[in-house]
Amino acid sequence: MLFGGAATGIFVFGIVMAVLGTLFGLAEMRARLQIDLAQQGNVFLLLFMGILASTLVAGPVINSIGNKIILVASSALVAAGMAGLAYAHSFVGAAIPAVLLGLGGGGLNTSTNVLVSDLYREKRGPMLNLLGIFYGIGALCIPLLAAVIAGHFAIAPQLLICAGLAGACALLFLAMHFPAASAPQGFSWREAMRVAQYPGVLVLGFLLFCQSGNEASISGWTSTYVGATGLSARTATLILAGYWAALMAGRLAVSGLLKIVGKRQLVLASGGGALIGAAILLTNRSEAMLVVGVLVIGLSYAGVFPTALAIAGDTYRKMAGTVFGLLFAIALVGGMSFPWAVGQISQKLGVRFGMVVPLAGAAGICVLAWRILRSDASVELARQSEGGK
């Protein structure tokens, strides 16, 4: 029952992460909001600011009073945000719901992951991976549903359905019984600054900064970019759905790949794949090649974030909680800044130039992953030298 509740909550978070990227690919929504590309980037910035704020607050609150209040309040915030978007007719009308979606989505993400982590201490890895699949299903549903109803129904009813689902989640969580609060120490910025000085922590942090930014840019701007090539809104949303499907399929394959490939090698290879996919997306306008580009990107992105976190967990076991908190904070700053930068560049130079941002992010991942790999090789060589003396 508790895992089912967590799966429902993370499913709603997947919807939150996919909804703006889907909506901005629809001519109907862009015309109703009367926003330019720079303002579109600003809406994404507000979404991720809300996610960052709630992520930092939710952890200590969960530690003090448990998951229930965060899950109920977060679901209610998402419901309000979806309803607000359904009736938005201006930039301000979209900006306020975006903040609400971010606040609610960040709370759902944090609380559901903490809940599953506490419930399944002996099977934490597999169960968190299973939870992530429900996130992918939620994210995939939105562009698929938008593609199905395109030209048949207005977008507002779809958003109101999402609002109703989030509201139902709030009622579900209100009726459920949750474990008592564990009351350990919450995230501390002072402690975070101390662990930031550990060798390699900031390299991993900047790698996740690039990865989070890339994921936010591709999920948020792909439908707009595809629409700018002259393809229909329905095609654009289906191509976006292809990205989410590839990401989910890749996540399912990662655990198997890690049995034959090292974690650091997988991150480097994933960065290279993301670079190739972004280049395909940037240099082609045909529908077939755009599909190839997003599929390569989705499959390549799948292994970066969870594997980098696994590297951090293996390397900094004694301070894993604080290290993870710092890494998530750095990553969310990337999630805020990259899609915003795409909007600013797109407004001045065009969407094609804006999509250089995830290409540069993929290059950054390759450089940082190579550095991690080389650093580990140097440490191993030093150990062998010490052993030979």
PLM segments and residue spans:
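Residue-level signature of mid-helix packing/kink "hotspots" within the transmembrane helices
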Residues: 18, 47-56, 139-140, 244-252, ...
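Extracytoplasmic gate region of multi-pass secondary transporters
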Residues: 20-21, 199-241, 245-249
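Helix-breaking motifs and short loop linkers at transmembrane-helix boundaries and internal kinks
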Residues: 66, 87-92, 121, 284-285, ...
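Cytoplasmic helix-loop-helix junction between adjacent transmembrane helices
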Residues: 97-133
